[in-house]
Swiss-Prot record:
Catalyzed reaction equations: Endohydrolysis of (1->4)-beta-D-glucosidic linkages in cellulose, lichenin and cereal beta-D-glucans
Enzyme Commission numbers on file: 3.2.1.4
Protein name: Endoglucanase type C
Gene Ontology BP terms: cellulose catabolic process
CDD domains: GH7_CBH_EG
Homology family: Belongs to the glycosyl hydrolase 7 (cellulase C) family.
Keywords, alphabetical: Carbohydrate metabolism, Cellulose degradation, Disulfide bond, Glycoprotein, Glycosidase, Hydrolase, Polysaccharide degradation, Pyrrolidone carboxylic acid, Signal
Gene3D superfamilies, sorted: Glycoside hydrolase, family 7, domain
Enzyme superclass (EC): hydrolase
Molecular function in Gene Ontology: cellulase activity
Annotated glycosylation sites: 74, 265, 318
Pyrrolidone carboxylic acid found at: 19
Length: 429
């Protein structure tokens, strides 16, 4: 759903994946997560958070930059991959640097702030293993994923996102001797939008390739609207595209198969206040169930919420065309016009990437390009054409932020003490 203009504004502070780390100490924020089974409940696990490599501060030795998002690397610094690795320096981030980038943790809570002292930071972070050297690879086909979220400070035009990317577990460090940063410094980002970035797998992107991989948007939302969308690609892992491969009919589904309650004409489901089934001004739990068949193929994506200790099932489709269900499957996607999704293999293709393993990414951002219209304007939500303008966002909320907490992963039906249907809604397997 996201256009290049959207991403350019959101990532202006994130230059790109950098190269050789300097001697500044990296101090990853600790984050407690949980792994759950029906038999034993949820057990705490230690993870760490790393900021995207572009947030670390990327520069040449003379202080000049090494390239901007949407472009090849600086030609002077990066005439070839080896020179790029030598000339482009990445700075480690200590605890104060993380705070100044709008990233703080406490126990199982992760807080992401859009502004620090009125300066745009718009952080994006990834989940590391306890050893901090590799990303935690999540294998979610046939499982359940839950988290708590606080959305009150995200008005129209904001996006607090939690999603999966099929990034390389080591951040691309093993792909080349010129890849120096790795997962430890947040390298190796990719998604289904296939944007050109100065570095690919942590190596100078001399050819100017688009950086593609499978993407599953579990949660893109503000306090007015929510969005779920799987984005499959025809190639496994991180792939450098060229030409038409990078386009809207290329190797990745850029639009995805989306679910937004407003778009299915259930406008009283989610919003600010007690008149909505899910009140976004108070903390709530988001539970996603990735249902597989006996062959292990992903066939459905289910969602329910928990607030005030009560399960709130997703509403059933209330528009003509799609089947009257409350989850995503191939029939729903085909009926809603997700043609690229179906062409690229649909739900099974997304599940194949989830089975191989994907990295958890979390971010907060706004869009100076279209004010996040695709998320919360028109049929997508109640926001008007200008509410999402960053100049207006700060008038409503001077300090936009989101807090994700209590991340729990396990077999279906295991991540909450509140009893919920194994497969929410009228449909049963």
């Amino acid at each position: 759903m996201k256009s290049l203009s959207l991403i350019l504004s959101a990532l202006a502070v994130q230059v790109a994946v950098a190269q050789t780390p300097d001697k500044a100490k990296e101090q990853h924020p600790k984050l407690e997560t949980y792994r759950c089974t029906k038999a034993s409940g949820c057990k705490k696990q230690t993870n760490y958070i790393v900021a995207d490599a572009g947030i670390h501060g990327i520069r040449q030795k003379n202080g000049a930059g090494c390239g901007d998002w949407g472009q090849k690397p600086n030609a002077t610094a990066c005439p070839d991959e080896a020179s790029c690795a030598k000339n482009c320096i990445l700075s480690g981030m200590d605890s104060n640097a993380y705070k100044n980038a709008g990233i703080t943790t406490s126990g199982n809570k992760l807080r992401l702030q859009q502004l620090i002292n009125n300066q745009l930071v718009s952080p994006r972070v990834y989940l590391l293993e306890e050893n901090k050297k590799k990303y935690e690879m999540l294998h979610l086909t046939g499982t359940e994923f839950s988290f708590d979220v606080e959305m009150e400070k995200l008005p129209c035009g904001m996006n607090g996102a939690l999603y999966l990317s099929e990034m390389p577990q080591d951040g691309g460090k093993s792909t080349s001797r010129n890849s120096k940063a790795g997962a430890y410094y947040g390298a190796g980002y990719c998604d289904a939008q296939c944007y050109v970035t100065p570095f690919i797998n942590g190596v100078g992107n001399i050819k100017g390739q688009g950086v593609c991989c499978n993407e599953l948007d579990i949660w893109e939302a503000n306090s007015r609207a929510t969005h779920i969308a799987p984005h499959p690609c025809s190639k496994p892992g991180l792939y450098g595209c060229t030409g038409d491969e990078c386009g809207s009919s290329g190797i990745c589904d850029k639009a995805g198969c989306g679910w937004n309650h407003n778009r299915i004409n259930v406008t009283d489901f989610y919003g600010r206040g007690k008149q909505y089934k899910v009140d976004s001004t108070r903390k709530f739990t988001v539970t996603s169930q990735f249902v597989a068949n006996k062959q292990g193929d992903l066939i459905e994506l289910h969602r329910h919420y928990i607030q005030d200790n009560k399960v709130i099932e997703s509403a059933v489709v209330n528009i003509s065309g799609p089947p009257k269900i409350n989850f995503i499957n191939d029939k729903y996607c085909a009926a809603t016009g997700a043609n690229e999704y179906m062409r690229l293999g649909g739900t099974k293709q997304m599940g194949d990437a989830m089975s191989r393993g994907m990295v958890l990414a979390m971010s907060v951002w706004w869009s100076e390009g279209d004010f996040m219209a695709w998320l919360d304007q028109g049929v997508a939500g109640p926001c008007d054409a200008t509410e999402g303008d960053p100049k207006n966002i700060v008038k409503v909320q001077p300090n936009p932020e989101v807090t994700f907490s209590n991340i729990r992963i396990g077999e279906i039906g295991s991540t909450s003490s509140v009893k919920a249907p194994a497969y929410p809604g009228p449909h049963r397997l």
